[in-house]
Amino acid sequence: MASLLRERFPDKGFRGGRPDPAHLRDLVEGDAAYYKADGSPLLILRRGGVSPGAAELAYPFLHQLRTSVSTNRANYSGVEKRNRVRKDGLISNTLVVPPVSTTVVGYFDRSQRFPFCRETALVSQHPEGWGTLQPLIREVSEIFRAALPQRWAAQDQAARATHPAYVIAGTPYTTLTVNNTVAAGYHKDSGDYHAGFGCL
């Protein structure tokens, strides 16, 4: 199934909110491709692309990650940020949301707080678990390459310009976000490489 969305999905009233059945236009049961009005890809769905072996190998570590939570993903969680209440009862200036089961694995780029690239804690503290994800990550990369070869090539070129210590070997990726049993709110990811494409 391929479909061109002629109208832009409105941000107002949706961003940060939860999906509702009334928002649905199509029920997709097989492979599908949706494109924006400008012809660029919005969504490519490939069912059954990952081998059972890679999925089964990765599952225990991915399941273990459900205990990793964040209180900093308001749009993703579908809940507004509020001031944190400290243990002593005082209101903090720090804005948080209720914890959602999400974490990042792979490698972080530089930021103001950390002016250097680095491994995520899960990579450095759980190298065996990280190793079990590698076949799955490589298979997702190959699905991406087959579905959107130009986007894959652009992302791969950017990865090759990055120090190899901070690229997931054999892929054009540096980082994975693992959202575990969380119903996402409408949101736009930040930090994605715009010439590439996000793979879920």
Identify the function of each model-found stretch:
Residues 1-199:
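Fe(II)/2-oxoglutarate oxygenase catalytic core
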